[in-house]
Curated annotation (Swiss-Prot):
NCBIfam families: PRK09212.1. This is Pyruvate dehydrogenase E1 component subunit beta. Its EC number is 1.2.4.1. Its cofactor is thiamine diphosphate. InterPro entries: THDP-binding (IPR029061), Transketo_C/PFOR_II (IPR009014), Transketolase-like_Pyr-bd (IPR005475), Transketolase_C (IPR033248). Its main location: plastid.
Amino acid sequence: MSEKLLYEALNEGIHEEIERDPKVFVIGEDIGHYGGSYKVTKGLFEKYGNLRILDTPIAENSFTGIAIGAAMTGLRPIIEGMNMGFLLLAFNQIANNAGMLHYTSGGNFTTPLVVRGPGGVGRQLGAEHSQRLESYFQSVPGLQMVACSTPYNAKGLIKSAIRSQNPIIFFEHVLLYNIKENIPQKEYLVPLEKAELVRSGNQITILTYSRMRYHVLQAAKTLIEKGYDPEIIDIISLKPLDMGTISTSLRKTHKVLIVEECMKTGGIGTTLKSAILESLFDFLDTPIMSLSSQDVPTPYNGFLEDLTVIQPSQIVEAAEKIILYS
């Protein structure tokens, strides 16, 4: 085991896959000598050169299109968005090309690529740089989405994503890059379509992902002190959802709370609600409650920024309300 920060775990995973497979390359802005805006690609340019680590101009639509074309020929590009919000400039390429080409070509082409980068609220980056694009990408046919939350799952997921035949949107949170954890030195993979049972419990199922995993864990300490027994699941796979793990939990607890940083309208929480109501309605003893960010542009002011995002105290209040519902 060795202690790694989350960004170091991602770096190590990418390094191993470039070493393992000559078809893997990285493309994006400032990923070369600079090492990426959050140092995820640090040291890769020096080792692999400019044919494997491609520094680009500020032109998201162009370098994303280049990467998709490369994927169509059998290469495995890793596209880094300096910020997830910037990838809106490449939405046409990601949606109409990467997501749909396998279908629209009658199976003649695949687009094995990873689109990754930082996003989320918490560093006073303003509205444009605090985007959470889960709601944008989840409606695009052909795309898979995962969100890492620990150094362990970050490394295992990025390796699995690079090896996948599908286009993967890989969400990283700006506030999680410096999370520390001991991870195995021996190679391992984390499945792309599997949720993680973070804590076993019997009274309520709390579904969450990314940064909100830590807000939920903080809230769980208070709930446990009050005598409650919450079950916590990090869904990890945002598309497709791991309904098997979710179903097993809800058939035990019969109560569910969804906690996300994505905005309420059209977010992952809305999709989860729909999926649960369609397949698990008979197992619910209470209405589903979902806690999401407010439908407002993220303020620059730090105090106001915090007000837009769900806090641990709100999770405690909501969980108690559901557990005591009659």
